[in-house]
Amino acid sequence: MRLIPLTRAAQVGKWAAAHIAKRINDFKPTAERPFVLGLPTGGTPLATYKALIELYQAGEVSFKHVVTFNMDEYIGIPADHPESYRSFMYNNFFNHIDIQEENINLLNGNTDNHEAECKRYEDKIKSYGKINLFMGGVGNDGHIAFNEPASSLSSRTRIKTLTEDTRIANSRFFDGDINQVPKYALTIGVGTLLDAEEVMILVTGHNKALALEAAVEGCVNHLWTVSALQLHPKAVIVCDEPSQQELKVKTVKYFSELEAENIKGF
């Protein structure tokens, strides 16, 4: 596992965007051989999306031959609802880059058959072989996507009940009213995420400190689903200083020295 210890959340966004752009450019994607990118929603990746848009506008990366798969979607709110994850992605990223509409893959939270929708999504991912890079965030309780504590570490895309903690955290997007936050969502599984060639998780803020500690220094544990990253051959965690407060000093020092060349300029 790589840990990229930075100082501020804005640096996390810029580092992650530069990393994604480099991966895409090194891959040299074509229509027949697209780069497959997994994407999250929420507050944490906003800085990354902003930086990626800037790189695109500067001509430093193109998304014309990039296929995307999003992590999750709420059940029970319209696709055009301002807080649906479809709306989030178009408003904060897709509308500002050259991605082709047919290359955007999103879960449908309004289908009548959730099981069939989840199978369709897994099959679509498999049709591309694999996801080359999956970016994600992490919840205060260590969940990745909507894989809440006690989720199976081999789980696939499925319907999940959201914990009260998650709904409280997400209520900030619903005028602070938890009753407006959906109780269920469709989400990729931990196993789906681990199938990706590379996984990059962004961690910012002191509220995520215990989750980062569990991911880096703890044991692999289904109560902290982010800890499953320890099983991945190519996992990267990009974090700011407030999120590092529960890590041992020697842990931060070790990774700071190891990644010194890679964090210069950020």
Curated annotation (Swiss-Prot):
Regulation: Allosterically activated by N-acetylglucosamine 6-phosphate (GlcNAc6P).
Function per UniProt: Catalyzes the reversible isomerization-deamination of glucosamine 6-phosphate (GlcN6P) to form fructose 6-phosphate (Fru6P) and ammonium ion.
Signal sequence interval, chain numbering: none
Site feature location: Part of the allosteric site: 151, 158, 160-161, 254
HAMAP family: GlcN6P_deamin
Keyword Nucleus: no
Pathway: Amino-sugar metabolism; N-acetylneuraminate degradation; D-fructose 6-phosphate from N-acetylneuraminate: step 5/5
Higher taxonomy: Bacteria, Pseudomonadati, Pseudomonadota, Gammaproteobacteria, Vibrionales
Enzyme Commission identifier(s): 3.5.99.6
Official protein name in the record: Glucosamine-6-phosphate deaminase
Subunit structure: Homohexamer; trimer of disulfide-linked dimers.
